[in-house]
Amino acid sequence: MSLNPRDVVIVDFGRTPMGRSKGGMHRNTRAEDMSAHLISKLLERNNKVDPAEVEDVIWGCVNQTLEQGWNIARMASLLTQIPHTSAAQTVSRLCGSSMSALHTAAQAIMTNNGDVFVIGGVEHMGHVSMMHGVDPNPHMSLHAAKASGMMGLTAEMLGKMHGITREQQDAFGLRSHQLAHKATLEGKFKDEIIPMQGYDENGFLKVFDYDETIRPDTTLESLAALKPAFNPKGGTVTAGTSSQITDGASCMIVMSAQRAQDLGIQPLAVIRSMAVAGVDPAIMGYGPVPATQKALKRAGLTIADIDFIELNEAFAAQALPVLKDLKVLDKMNEKVNLHGGAIALGHPFGCSGARISGTLLNVMKQNGGTFGVSTMCIGLGQGIATVFERV
């Protein structure tokens, strides 16, 4: 494959094991330390990259307060081998934050404003709760449906509009746990999980190299027994078909194709296009549809050209309408989230965009695909998507 000098390539990807936010493995680990551990280990693994060459550390994080405040990108960077002469910024696009971090780095590389970037994101939802310090504008209900800030209710709305049944959602949730468990047993996550010290349920320090969020004993019967989580009267969305509240971080090394060639590095993939899009906040989960369509058009591709898709599983009631309207629902078992998704692994907000993108690249590497799309919905009505080509 012929690459242009300013093409944007992904050199490597790593993530923490995903930990439960309530009493999980990361309960005594700070968000900056999780982030710094990933950055340091990924740079050690890629010793041809001089940390002094890093132009900027771009880190996604949604709730930027407490230990995640005051520019956590810089806080984490200062704990690593990256010198003080490199810069750092924290970005938020809610659920799409670390994919936005990737896009920001890519745009800088494309415009010759740097060659080497470290991107990723973190969310410690056990230490910094989802609503900590949040004060929504009461006048917002004049401009968008009042329930638009309640993600579970927007999923209920989207599922109802598209005729998604409770049974379909339960089957999708079961699939996520089964595939994530299978991927774990077969070592499919080995290249992406960077082991970390944490604490087990008995309080003993140990090294974790697996996700503690996966429930291999999940059954359709156990899912069917769960009560609706957001709409008790007639709702279909449950805790078992929603993304888990978890703690985690993800990281990528991104650079220009020219710099990768100069360093003798074989990249994982090249970015072919990027896009963001807005939708009605009341159906925020639909955002991946226009974002993906826009990204495909920019890449000169159609959905039929795409070998693998990683779609963030915010809710089964949201994911299924997206797959239906992207016309891949009938190809789901061959193309979509082959290692499970956020229903099994969790959705630490700032982490997820880079996490699903990196998982996609590993799926492509392991299965020989050429083109892949990572995409996700975003609270209050947005979508974001990236098209990759395996190098």
UniProtKB/Swiss-Prot annotation:
Q: Name one process (GO BP) from the record.
A: fatty acid beta-oxidation
The record's catalysed reaction(s) read: an acyl-CoA + acetyl-CoA = a 3-oxoacyl-CoA + CoA
Catalytic residues per the record?
Answer: 95, 347, 377
So where does this one cross the membrane?
A: none
Q: Name one GO molecular function term.
A: acetyl-CoA C-acyltransferase activity
CC per GO annotation: cytoplasm
Subcellular location as annotated? Cytoplasm
Q: Name one Pfam family in it.
A: Thiolase_C
Q: Which domain of life is it from?
A: Bacteria
- Subcellular location, principal: cytoplasm
EC number(s) on file? 2.3.1.16
**EC top class, in one word?**
transferase
Arranged from A to Z, the UniProt key words for this protein are: Acyltransferase, Cytoplasm, Fatty acid metabolism, Lipid degradation, Lipid metabolism, Transferase
- InterPro entries in UniProt: FadA, Thiolase, Thiolase-like, Thiolase-like_sf_Thiolase, Thiolase_acyl_enz_int_AS, Thiolase_AS, Thiolase_C, Thiolase_CS
Whether Cell membrane counts among this entry's keywords is no
Which pathway does it serve? Lipid metabolism; fatty acid beta-oxidation
Q: What does this protein do?
A: Catalyzes the final step of fatty acid oxidation in which acetyl-CoA is released and the CoA ester of a fatty acid two carbons shorter is formed.
Outline the subunit composition.
Heterotetramer of two alpha chains (FadB) and two beta chains (FadA).
Q: Describe the family membership recorded for this protein in Swiss-Prot or TrEMBL.
A: Belongs to the thiolase-like superfamily. Thiolase family.
Report what the protein is called.
3-ketoacyl-CoA thiolase
Q: Which gene encodes it?
A: fadA
